[in-house]
């Protein structure tokens, strides 16, 4: 049986650093929200079988998303943290039979709306059949400094450092097990949860265009990238 590829987009955050009057995933860029741009990436990709968006139970914007993408599952069972939101989404996929333990879950930040299709293809091709899973990442190009009290305390050796991106691809069963701990403190992405099990996920070459909309000034770059597509 063919292993399914299921995109899971945690979208329960409030995006406080972005400073808008609504969660950043619902900020409009052009005629669509950031989240709609992100969903479209997966809906257009032939290797993705299903897209699921997990939002907060109090979300008042999700109905528009469901109307725009009636085939997408939009669930209001998000948690207080990203890890909780992903855990809830994976658990429901397994519970209702939309995913088996052996299917691939591709967890992607709602605010990464410029993911190139070729980067997504590369991740699926290189990590889709790997039991340890894998993530998109790019090597660090800039010099990194460690700071104390607003002053440089050290220069960090960057040779072996990579910047994690999303999607992060793991088997549903593995991801469910990795996120099953009651205390998810320190889990900043899915790979870090899997690493705690002693597993070493693959690094797949990402793309600099796959940036995360975090600060207000990022919106300018995102607009340029989306207009260039």
Swiss-Prot record:
It catalyses: 2-C-methyl-D-erythritol 4-phosphate + CTP + H(+) = 4-CDP-2-C-methyl-D-erythritol + diphosphate. Pathway: Isoprenoid biosynthesis; isopentenyl diphosphate biosynthesis via DXP pathway; isopentenyl diphosphate from 1-deoxy-D-xylulose 5-phosphate: step 2/6. One of its GO terms (biological process) is isopentenyl diphosphate biosynthetic process, methylerythritol 4-phosphate pathway. GO terms for molecular function: 2-C-methyl-D-erythritol 4-phosphate cytidylyltransferase activity. Pfam families: IspD. The keyword Nucleotidyltransferase applies. The keyword Magnesium does not apply. Gene3D superfamilies: Spore Coat Polysaccharide Biosynthesis Protein SpsA, Chain A. Its EC number is 2.7.7.60. The record marks 17, 24 as: Transition state stabilizer. Keywords: Isoprene biosynthesis, Nucleotidyltransferase, Transferase. The record marks 158, 212 as: Positions MEP for the nucleophilic attack. PROSITE patterns: ISPD. Belongs to the IspD/TarI cytidylyltransferase family. IspD subfamily. Catalyzes the formation of 4-diphosphocytidyl-2-C-methyl-D-erythritol from CTP and 2-C-methyl-D-erythritol 4-phosphate (MEP). This is 2-C-methyl-D-erythritol 4-phosphate cytidylyltransferase. The gene is ispD.
């Amino acid at each position: 049986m063919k292993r399914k590829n299921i995109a899971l987009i945690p979208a329960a955050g409030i995006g406080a650093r972005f400073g808008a009057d609504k969660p950043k995933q619902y900020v409009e860029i052009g005629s669509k929200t950031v989240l709609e741009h992100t969903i479209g990436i997966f809906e257009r990709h032939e290797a993705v079988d299903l897209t699921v968006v997990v939002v907060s139970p109090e979300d008042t914007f999700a109905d528009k998303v469901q109307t725009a993408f009636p085939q997408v599952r939009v669930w209001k069972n998000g948690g207080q943290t990203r890890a909780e939101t992903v855990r809830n989404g994976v658990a429901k996929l397994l519970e209702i039979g939309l995913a088996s333990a052996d299917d691939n879950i591709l967890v992607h930040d709602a605010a990464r709306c410029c993911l190139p299709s070729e980067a997504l293809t590369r991740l699926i091709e290189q990590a889709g059949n790997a039991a340890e899973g894998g993530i998109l990442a790019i090597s660090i190009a800039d010099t990194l400094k460690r700071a104390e009290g607003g002053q440089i305390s050290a220069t960090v050796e960057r040779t072996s450092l990579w910047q994690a991106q999303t999607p992060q691809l793991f088997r549903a069963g593995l991801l469910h097990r990795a996120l099953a701990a009651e205390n998810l403190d320190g889990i900043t992405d899915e790979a870090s949860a899997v690493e705690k099990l002693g597993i070493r996920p693959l690094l797949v070459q990402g793309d600099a265009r796959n940036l995360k909309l975090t600060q207000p000034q990022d919106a300018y770059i995102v607009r340029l990238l989306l207009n260039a597509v």
